[in-house]
A protein has these predicted regions:
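Short cytosolic juxtamembrane segments of multi-pass membrane proteins
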Residues: 264-269
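Generic structural signal for small/hydrophobic residues in well-ordered secondary structure
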Residues: 30, 108-110, 178, 184, ...
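Residue-level recognition of membrane-helix boundary sites in multi-pass small-molecule transporters
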Residues: 39-42, 100, 113, 187
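Secretory targeting signals
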Residues: 4-20, 25, 40, 47-89, ...
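Transmembrane helix segments
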Residues: 185-220
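Helix-capping/transition residues at the boundaries of transmembrane alpha-helices
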Residues: 33, 93, 104-106, 175, ...
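A short amphipathic helical element positioned immediately N-terminal to and/or at the very start
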Residues: 23-35
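Transmembrane helix boundary and interhelical loop/hinge segments in multi-pass membrane proteins
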Residues: 67-71, 88-107, 111-112
Length: 269
């Protein structure tokens, strides 16, 4: 006895009407991922809290003629400059350390778009923290006026842009570069502290021992090159901008390119 079997035609899935996830939506998801974890959320709160603590200490201990809003804003920028990159590192390395990579790059297979969205989220997060820090600087200035100061509320434009905004944006890219290069949260944080704390000390010692190295240091060490952004009139000269650019290529651009290439090729398990 034989049975007639009707051939089955393979079906197809029509995706022509499916719209791609927008970059704005990807950035919102990445921003939410950064703050949905307890570590990311509380670290962001801790940064703002640390800025407030330092501002209060400065308001109580600083001379009366050094309690202008620009002074408190500069201090806020200095504190953010050290800890903001860690927040960005935690955002970038979450794909590997929290094993989110399989989900992220399944929902958005084009890793370059996901990476750009992550960078955009990092910049938005940094902008939010900077706004809060600027508000905390207002509180510090008011407290300074209560402790004997006569604050000036106007802020030098170079301090605002170079010493506060630009310096912290550079910090975001440094954290992003280290995070993508290592893709491991503890290792990236250790590497960042080695870069931001140990390396400047070593360069300072070598500069003290060798005048020739002292002249070369701003061209090859990014922390040293950025000093004009925080000191003096907050306006680097033409040569100092060239030093910032050269050292930035070494310590920021090259690691970022290598880290991006690694993230685009790494196999998540």
């Amino acid at each position: 006895m034989s049975t007639t079997v009707t051939p089955v035609t393979p079906g197809t899935i029509d995706l022509s009407g499916t719209t791609q996830v927008s970059m704005l939506q990807l950035s919102r998801v990445e921003l939410r991922k950064a703050l949905d974890t307890r570590a990311g959320r509380w670290f962001a709160i801790a940064i703002v809290g640390l800025v407030l603590l330092v501002e209060v200490i400065y308001a109580v201990t600083a001379p009366d003629n050094a309690k202008d809003y620009g002074d408190f804003l500069g201090i806020a920028g200095f504190v953010l400059g050290y800890f903001m990159p860690i927040l960005i590192i935690m955002l970038v390395t979450s794909e590997a350390s929290q094993r989110n990579g399989l989900v992220t790059f399944t929902l958005e297979p084009r890793r370059a778009r996901a990476l750009v969205a992550k960078l955009a989220a990092g910049l938005l997060l940094a902008a939010g923290v900077m706004v809060l820090a600027a508000a905390v600087a207002v509180v510090g200035t008011l407290l300074g006026s209560l402790t004997g100061g006569s604050p000036v509320w106007s802020v030098d434009a170079n301090l605002l842009f170079n010493g506060f905004v630009l310096a912290n944006v550079v910090g975001v890219f440094i954290g992003f570069a280290i995070g993508t290069l290592l893709m491991n949260t503890p290792a990236a944080i250790v590497a960042y502290f080695a870069y931001s704390l140990i390396l400047p000390i070593a360069v300072g010692i070598l500069s003290a021992l060798s005048s020739a190295f002292e002249k070369v240091a701003p061209w090859i060490e990014f922390n040293t090159a950025q000093v004009p952004l925080f000191t003096g009139d907050y306006t680097p000269s033409g040569e100092e901008w060239a030093q910032i650019a050269t050292a930035g290529v070494i310590w920021m651009v090259i690691p970022l390119v290598l880290g991006t290439m690694r993230l685009l090729r790494i196999e998540f398990k």
